[in-house]
Amino acid sequence: MGLFNAHAVAQQRADRIATLLQSFADGQLDTAVGEAPAPGYERLYDSLRALQRQLREQRAELQQVESLEAGLAEMSRQHEAGWIDQTIPAERLEGRAARIAKGVNELVAAHIAVKMKVVSVVTAYGQGNFEPLMDRLPGKKAQITEAIDGVRERLRGAAEATSAQLATAAYNARIKSALDNVSANVMIADNDLNIIYMNRTVSEMLGRAEADIRKQLPNFDAGRLMGANIDVFHKNPAHQRHLLANLTGVHKAELNLGGRRFSLDVVPVFNDANERLGSAVQWTDRTEEHRAEQEVSQLVQAAAAGDFSKRVEEAGKEGFFLRLAKDLNSLVDTADRGLRDVSRMLGALAQGDLTQRIEADYQGTFGQLKDFSNDTAQSLSRMLGQIREAADTINTAASEIASGNAELSARTEQQASSLEETASSMEELTSTVKLNAENARQANSLAANASEVATQGGTVVQKVVSTMSSINESARKIADIIGVIDGIAFQTNILALNAAVEAARAGEQGRGFAVVAGEVRTLAQRSAAAAKEIKTLISDSVDKVENGNTLVAQAGQTMSDIVVAIRRVTDIMSEIAAASAEQSTGIEEVNSAVSQMDDMTQQNAALVEEAAAAAEAMQEQAGLLNQSVAVFRLDTPPSVVQLASARPSAPRPSAPAPLARSGMARASKARKEDGWEEF
């Protein structure tokens, strides 16, 4: 009877423990564990309380994951709206959620996706599986791992201690039932590494992966794993056997089988006597998770290299991974479209095309980048348009200046040519006037001699007959000289007329020259009149000489008349000599004025040449500026700028007929030798 009561009490206590575990499995973590019902159960109940605390912490961590999902969704929406500097508030998260948020934030900082490692235990906790082994956490979090390990050890020890009792059997049955129904993939092996337990989830998982595992392990059969050795998962199991034999804590491993990637959390199982009973393994199929990690990693690496064409494959994903893929793709797509638009516009600017604009609708930082880029292109287009119009204006002005300089150069050349011809004519006129003065001086001397002879004629009248022939010859010579003087006066008159014409052509500058030419003409006319009078007198003298032989008797009576006439001739010849001297002085002054005008014309020609060179240089610079600006395409064609001349250019006067004088030819040759070919 006492034994029966003991079994009943043990059964009741086992039921209590199983009820607590079932409530934990159902998510009822606020159920009070209570105190140990009897000595020996303290460690077990302490472990249950530690397990309850651990599960509460796991639930809190699940809430952190939900906060992470909310932050990621908000970041995705903000990125879709263009605010690419939005990040997940990692400072509000803890543990793995904070690390994932930090990785995503690094992706956001570089406008790329960040590699995000999603741990399989988070998914298992979300599904209500409380059996997976915890990672070896640092710092104070290591107490959580130790508490869970202690629970596993004490549960196994309690099961072995009560294996002979019905309560223990019931307890084990309930434990097994709980493990069978949890979502975690649990496998237990004994010390010989033979598989002694597999829950339904791990069997189903390995069954789904059987075809892939056989690619690497052809003899693998998921339906015959119970009782088999775990060596079936390894081609060379010696290393794994040694590792498990010396295992004292949680061991994490990654197993790749036929393209499948499994995460293994292995923990040794001890009884209350600290005897090794075997090992428990939590399997997690991380194939999809690993594939997602690889895709995110490739996306990050491509974006870091400037390639935004990569995307995370959305097909075949669901839940969190699907949302993550969509959000990352949306993020990269927004960055890609924005950078492509900016690249297209900058490429067009580099090619000189200022008509390109960013038309797509962006917000946030990309919106500002769009506005700044469009404003920059608009400002450049407006500035280059103004430069192009200014260059056209300068080019037109330079062309008109060059044209005006060409006309001015031609006129200056004609003026220089006329002045050179005038100078040549004045040289000849000066030479003629000097010759005329010399002849007048000689005539004056002859007239003086004739007067002296006439004065002595009274005393030598007896010699008149003998010298009549000589007088007749002298009279003929005088007549010839007077003819020459008459011709000189006529030529002087013609030259004075030509000088007046040239002075009229010179305009205002030739006014003084015209006055001098008029005086010369007056003197020439007076010389001509005097020459005519002398010619008349000489003709009369010749007639008288011819009649001298018959009038010798009358010579004495008319001698006084001859003396008076000869004195008159002497006076006239003196006047002719004085007029010739004045004429020579006037011609020299005219020649000096013409020389000064020629010098001024040459200086003007030099200034015109410099102005023409400056205008050509300005026109050339304007052309270069037009060529530089012409490579740019603007929104609107530049307006044509024309400068109206201040006055219509005067027609170029026809060049005067060249004078056939050797002096003109010599002057022209001298100009060419001095480098004045343009004038």
UniProtKB/Swiss-Prot annotation:
Changing residue 264 to I/Q: Shows wild-type O(2) responses. The keyword Repeat applies. Changing residue 283 to L: Cannot form stable O(2) bound in vitro. Signal-on-biased mutant. 50 to 80% of the cells continue to tumble when air is removed. Changing residue 202 to C: Signal-off mutant that does not respond to either O(2) or CO. One of its GO terms (cellular component) is plasma membrane. Residues 333-385 form the HAMP domain. It is found in: Cytoplasm. Residues 411-425 have a biased composition (Polar residues). Residues 405-425, 644-679 are annotated as: Disordered. Changing residue 220 to A: Signal-off mutant that does not respond to either O(2) or CO. Heme binds at residue 234. One of its GO terms (biological process) is positive aerotaxis. Changing residue 264 to K: Signal-off mutant that does not respond to the addition or removal of O(2). Does not bind either O(2) or CO. The record marks 283 as: Plays a crucial role in stabilization of the heme-bound O(2). A motif (GWEEF pentapeptide. Important for methylation by CheR2) lies at residues 675-679. One of its GO terms (molecular function) is transmembrane signaling receptor activity. The record marks 264 as: Important for gas binding and signaling. It holds the Pfam family PAS_8. Homodimer. The PAS domains form dimers in the presence and absence of oxygen. Interacts with the methyltransferase CheR2 via the C-terminal McpB pentapeptide GWEEF. Interacts with the methylesterase/gutaminase CheB2, which also binds to the GWEEF pentapeptide. Belongs to the methyl-accepting chemotaxis (MCP) protein family. This is Methyl-accepting chemotaxis protein McpB. It comes from Pseudomonas aeruginosa (strain ATCC 15692 / DSM 22644 / CIP 104116 / JCM 14847 / LMG 12228 / 1C / PRS 101 / PAO1).
